Amino acid sequence: MIASHLLSPLIFLEQQPAYSSVVIGALVVCLVCLVWPTESAKRAPPAPNFGVPRIGDAAAFLADPVSFVQKATQKCGSIFQIKLLVANLVYLRGVKLNRMYTDVKEDTWSFGGGIGLFLRKIAKPGYFDHLRTLVNSLNRGVNRKAALEHYFQLIEEEAGKALQGWSQRGAVPVFEETSRFVHRVIVRCLMGQDFYDHRLDELYEILHHMEADIGHPFNLLLPDWIPHPAARRLEQNRDRFAQIFEQQVADRRRNPEIWRDSLDYISFTLEDPRTAHLEGYLPSHHTVLMFAAHTSTVASISWTILELLRNPDYLAQLRQSLAAHPDARKCPELLAGIKETGRHYSGVHMFRTTHRAVELEGGKYLVPPNWIVSISPYLTHHDPEIFHTPQHWIPERWLQPDDRMQNLNNPREAAFLQFGAGCHRCPGEALAGIIAQGLLATLVRRYDMVWGKEGPPTDLTALDFSKVGSPWLEGDASIAIRPKVAE
């Protein structure tokens, strides 16, 4: 959560004496900038002003972002600002403003800038200047029909191997083991068989080391030119990933005939004239993709497994439907279950950074450049005026939708935001979908599953939003699976 990252430096100062004077100086400059009156401040959206002046809103946002945004909406309406320690954030609430938010062009409000708030430290300087070109290449490279068909075969193969291993271990932590499965699929499909055969484990270590440091408060508080341990570790892991990438690409070029018809995404970007000249940024691109494709896909699969255990009637219905649909990608009950998980367990915030001033409410409010603008997929998905009984996982809502439900994910509504909306949909939607479909279909078809020895989690509302993407369950949950007995 951005609030925690921007505020928590205060509690680290005594533990980081070598950086205290630098941090304090930066804070003073930032606070002066925040309180200095400007013309745009006269047209700024209202702030809820909870608690202690200047820091009360930020502290409340840090402590419980969902509750804060709900209370701020009640007090201020659908547009309000949150004065964070080193940034100003404007929050937009409601389907109408969601639609406007997703339709604003990238050169005005930047999704790339929002991603960069968290991931700029793991990318080579200059990478985000080419983000649009590289993201567009995902549609051409990953979403090719031949590529997706090939990827699904690999996914089913990896699912079979992963689940066989789960079945031999008694009980496994769902999120942790799903994380390993998703990583194997991402490396094999997007990077290629050579990365999978020779670099899989080291890449997983790099991913987790980066996850541990990416949210360090100094990475968000301090300018890039001020060194500190977390930034140095990120730089070391970033450079190691680049070394691995360059070594594997060099090996490929010594044996080009092997890779001539390869469907992996690295091969595509190296050969496509629109991206080949950006080879120096491709290591950063694939580092960012590891984060973007990993966290939310793990959440989608893991939460669906837990909800199927909690809803045995739907699990039985899903088994029957999978028996009637040899291609899991066409199984309505499976697609509905995954979609409902995407609604129920979505990320709290979506961020964009502003490059140009934008007026809201007919000029009543002005959002200036260099601010952050946010909407909440989580609160949109839990709005009872949009979704009936939103606090419950009910995949049937997608199987027999009324007219309102059928329109939720079109540009006019922007009420279902798992993969964005309007002209800003996630280009990895298809791949994330087949990864989830492949593992879940294999699990339900071939295995029976029960809770681990600890039983079901005592609190499935203990959501961990600390990662970049959809929440995981705090403390994880264990399950045991065993092969189904042939009938």
From Swiss-Prot:
One of its GO terms (cellular component) is membrane. It is an enzyme of class 1 (oxidoreductase). The gene is pyvB. The keyword Acyltransferase does not apply. Heme binds at residue 426. SUPFAM superfamilies: Cytochrome P450 (SSF48264). This is Cytochrome P450 monooxygenase pyvB. InterPro entries: CYP450_sterol_14alpha_dmase, Cyt_P450, Cyt_P450_CS, Cyt_P450_E_grp-IV, Cyt_P450_sf. Keywords: Heme, Iron, Membrane, Metal-binding, Monooxygenase, Oxidoreductase, Transmembrane, Transmembrane helix. It is a single-pass membrane protein. Pathway: Secondary metabolite biosynthesis. It comes from Aspergillus violaceofuscus (strain CBS 115571). The subsequent chain release by Dieckmann condensation (DKC) could be catalyzed by the TE domain present at the C-terminus of pyvA and/or the alpha/beta hydrolase pyvD, installing the tetramic acid moiety. The chain crosses the membrane at residues 17-37. GO terms for molecular function: heme binding; iron ion binding; monooxygenase activity; oxidoreductase activity, acting on paired donors, with incorporation or reduction of molecular oxygen. It is found in: Membrane. Belongs to the cytochrome P450 family.
